[in-house]
């Protein structure tokens, strides 16, 4: 004899039990519709993802025959960008413009001078920072003479003395020694009279 449509009652475990049914008979949980189809679509997606990954790996392959050269991206930094960063950093330090400076000379250990003509000078005494902005020229110490003499320090004066000592030696080495009896002043006439005696005679 078959019983149909028997009402179910949930037990403490949450499983449905047929009331008045056979002992041990339980209601089977219903499966979601299209479960096998969902699994198939998931498998297809993973296969497609693996294919895409393989294509990407083939494109990114480094080295080997038939691969294109990898171009290194070179970022060109302009001087204006560096200047902006520098000005921003200087603004943080609180620098002030110093006006009325016509030239700045920086003396090096090699005896050369880094010369700035009409530079922009900024200073921050609290940060002990000075900036000199402008066109710089590297010149020899001898080129800057005599206007630079009052700017020379002790080290520069010693190097100037060395240069002064070296110059006569170079001039002597550069010229051939004069032969005896040869007159070096051809254009200057010889003095015949004594001018001192002539002036004394005029005074008397």
Curated annotation (Swiss-Prot):
It is found in: Cytoplasm; Nucleus. The modification Omega-N-methylarginine is found at residue 19. Residues 80-145 form the NAC-A/B domain. The keyword Transcription regulation applies. The modification N6-methyllysine is found at residues 44, 52. Residues 1-11 have a biased composition (Polar residues). It holds the Pfam family NAC. Keywords: Chaperone, Cytoplasm, Methylation, Nucleus, Phosphoprotein, Protein transport, Transcription, Transcription regulation, Transport. GO terms for cellular component: cytosol; nascent polypeptide-associated complex; nucleus. The keyword Protein transport applies. Residues 181-190 have a biased composition (Acidic residues). GO terms for biological process: in utero embryonic development; negative regulation of protein localization to endoplasmic reticulum; protein transport. It comes from the Eukaryota. Transmembrane segments: none annotated. The modification Phosphoserine is found at residues 30, 171. PANTHER family: TRANSCRIPTION FACTOR BTF3 FAMILY MEMBER (PTHR10351). Part of the nascent polypeptide-associated complex (NAC), which is a heterodimer of NACA and BTF3 (via NAC-A/B domains). NAC associates with ribosomes through the BTF3/NACB subunit. Both subunits can contact nascent polypeptide chains. When associated with NACA, prevents inappropriate targeting of non-secretory polypeptides to the endoplasmic reticulum (ER). Binds to nascent polypeptide chains as they emerge from the ribosome and blocks their interaction with the signal recognition particle (SRP), which normally targets nascent secretory peptides to the ER. BTF3 is also a general transcription factor that can form a stable complex with RNA polymerase II. Required for the initiation of transcription. Belongs to the NAC-beta family. This is Transcription factor BTF3. It comes from Mus musculus. The lineage of its organism: Eukaryota, Metazoa, Chordata, Craniata, Vertebrata.
